[in-house]
Amino acid sequence: MFESIQGLLDEHADLQIRLSDPAVHADQSLARKLGRRYAELSTIVEGYHQVQQLSDDLAAAKEMASEDSEFAAEVPVLEEQLAHAQEKLRRLLIPRDPDDGRDVILEVKAGEGGDESALFAADLVRMYSRYAESKGWKIEVISATESDLGGYKDIQIAVKGRSNDPAEGVFAALKFEGGVHRVQRVPVTESQGRIHTSAAGVLVFPEVDEPEEVEISQNDLKIDVYRSSGPGGQSVNTTDSAVRITHFPTGIVVAMQNEKSQLQNREAGMRVLRARILAHQQELIDAENSAVRKSQIRTMDRSERIRTYNFPENRIADHRTGYKSYNLDAVMNGDLGPVIQSAIEMDEQSRLDALSGSSE
């Protein structure tokens, strides 16, 4: 697996030269793209040098072991360190999701359960917002439709966080949140104290850095305008400011009504549409690659139930990874790291298994 690393070392050296050229930074989109790739390769180069150094140290220790007991004692320690470094490098060489370094547009939609589901959708948004704050990311509400009790029938938020390392990107962490989230608790509307089960759906899309990344022909769009509505369906605007955009080639439909003007809603709608089309394009690429399709959690059915939040037991369980913990209160306050990490590790292992299988 390490045989192909020389090409990556050469690419890293070439990128270092290119990024020192002021002309490259005149094109911010190009500079950002090259910077992400350089950061990704820097981690691999560092891991490779660590393996080389430990290999040299181990060889020297073995050579001196027969003459010096201290060197002999170092041999098993260095062997363990080398094995760990090789495994780390092997994982670093697994091809990354090309969208890992991107920001995210995250949608939460109330599902079965009526008002309780809408309240749970609001709880999920709060959970993601607090997790984002802990990572130093920024949250922006793009569109939201509130329920009568203050929850969300649906909401779209942008999550932004600058990182040159794709492994630390917003999409790298949040892409595994897509799916159906089930909650078990006593609703605020329940007078008998009975536990109810409801659900909310989460969709996660990588956001494009520049509008030009996704080509959209105006001939492929149908744009309808209508009056925006608030909780209970009542009209909150006397003008046709809400916008519904249909993209014929993909069948994707985006509705936007939060902004005050039709133009602002159209711009917000196009922003979301570009993110959805980008995700759609990547899904088509994944579908052509059987190894990726089989290994990535990201490509699972969005209607799949991925997680259960059991409030009476203070328990959270991820049904894909087997993760279970009894600190639901902390998770709902943004302590989402261990849950997300379980999905990242499962995805890495699946990719590694697929890669190992293809090389046999």
Swiss-Prot record:
Belongs to the prokaryotic/mitochondrial release factor family. Methylated by PrmC. Methylation increases the termination efficiency of RF1. The lineage of its organism: Bacteria, Bacillati, Actinomycetota, Actinomycetes, Micrococcales. Gene3D superfamilies: 3.30.160.20, 3.30.70.1660, 6.10.140.1950. Peptide chain release factor 1 directs the termination of translation in response to the peptide chain termination codons UAG and UAA. This is Peptide chain release factor 1. One of its GO terms (molecular function) is translation release factor activity, codon specific. It holds the Pfam family PCRF. One of its GO terms (cellular component) is cytoplasm. The gene is prfA. PROSITE patterns: RF_PROK_I. Its main location: cytoplasm. It comes from Renibacterium salmoninarum (strain ATCC 33209 / DSM 20767 / JCM 11484 / NBRC 15589 / NCIMB 2235). Keywords: Cytoplasm, Methylation, Protein biosynthesis. PANTHER family: LD18447P. The modification N5-methylglutamine is found at Q234.
